[in-house]
Amino acid sequence: MPGIETIKSSWADEVELDYGGLPPTTETVENGHKYVTEYKYNKDDKKTKVVRTYKISKQVVPKTVAKRRTWTKFGESKNDKPGPNSQTTMVSEEIIMQFLNSKEDEKANDPLLDPTKNIAKCRICNGEHWSVNCPYKGTAMDTNMMEKKATAAAAAAVDAPKSGKYVPPFLKDSVGKVGMGMRGRDDTAAIRISNLSESMTEADLEELVKKIGPQSKMYLARDKNTGLCKGFAYVHFKQRKDAAAAIEILNGHGYDHLILSVEWSKPQNN
C-alpha cells in the first residue's frame, strides 16, 4: 500500500484557508515588552506577517498630558485600547520646538553677527575686504585716495569750531616756533606710527608721509644689535593740521601686510 505523501504548505496558505482573509491583529505583553502581530499584503499581493516589539516604560508626564490620555476615543478607534493604533493612527513627522529667551532673540537679530554680511570695508576702493588685501594697494587709485583724505582732513582741521577753552601760546600756530625754542622741540605736531615691519627704512617712512604734508623731523627706532626696525617711528610735521590728517589717513591703513596704528605723540616730561 503506497504511503501517504505529506503536503507541506506555508503559514500564509494555512492562514488563508483558516480565515479566508487577513487575520486580526494580536497583542501580547511579556516581561515588560509588548508584541504586536499583524498581517497585510505586500507589493506582490502576498500575505505577510509583521511583528512589532515595544518596550514598556513608565515616565512622569504633565497633568494635562495624563488627562488627555483619559479621553474617550471615537470613530474607527472607538473600541481601541489605550495608546495609538497603527491601523488608524500614523505619525507624519516629528516637530521639535525650541524656545528662545530675550537675550538669544536679540543676539539672533544682531546684524553684526550675521555670517552672510561682510563687515570688512576697504579704505582704498570701499570694497568688501580689508585694506591690506586690496588689489589696488600701491596703485594710482591708492595715491589719489590718500590725497583726497589729506585734503579733507586739513579742511576739517581749519574749519573746526573753537571750543572757547584757553589755549597756551606755544600750542598756537602763530607762536609755535617760540614754544619750540623754549622747550627745545615741538611735540604738538608729532605723531607716533607703530606696528611697522622690521624691514622698514627711513626712505620708506618718508615715502609714506611725504604726500600728506611737510615734515620737520622723522625718527625710525632701530635695534642697536641687528639694525632692524623696532616697529615704531615718530614724525614731526610743520603744521598740526597735517599731523591730524596723517592720523586720519594712516591709522588702520594696510602697509607691508600689517595694519598701522597712528596716534598723537605724548610729550616728554623734562
Curated annotation (Swiss-Prot):
- Which SUPFAM superfamilies does this chain map to? RNA-binding domain, RBD
GO CC entries? eukaryotic 43S preinitiation complex; eukaryotic 48S preinitiation complex; eukaryotic translation initiation factor 3 complex
Keyword Lyase attributed: no
Recorded coiled-coil stretches: none
Keywords on record: Cytoplasm, Initiation factor, Protein biosynthesis, RNA-binding
Alphabetically, the GO molecular function entries are: RNA binding; translation initiation factor activity
UniProt KW Zinc-finger keyword: no
CDD domains assigned to the protein according to its UniProt record, in alphabetical order: eIF3G, RRM_eIF3G_like
GO terms of biological process kind: formation of cytoplasmic translation initiation complex
Q: Where can this protein be found?
A: Cytoplasm
Give the RRM domain ranges: 189-267
Give the family, as the similarity comment puts it.
Belongs to the eIF-3 subunit G family.
Q: How does it assemble?
A: Component of the eukaryotic translation initiation factor 3 (eIF-3) complex. The eIF-3 complex interacts with pix.
PANTHER family xrefs: EUKARYOTIC TRANSLATION INITIATION FACTOR 3 SUBUNIT G
Explain the purpose of this protein. Answer: RNA-binding component of the eukaryotic translation initiation factor 3 (eIF-3) complex, which is involved in protein synthesis of a specialized repertoire of mRNAs and, together with other initiation factors, stimulates binding of mRNA and methionyl-tRNAi to the 40S ribosome. The eIF-3 complex specifically targets and initiates translation of a subset of mRNAs involved in cell proliferation. This subunit can bind 18S rRNA.
> What's the name of the protein?
Eukaryotic translation initiation factor 3 subunit G-1
What organism does the UniProt record list as the source? Drosophila ananassae
Taxon lineage: Eukaryota, Metazoa, Ecdysozoa, Arthropoda, Hexapoda
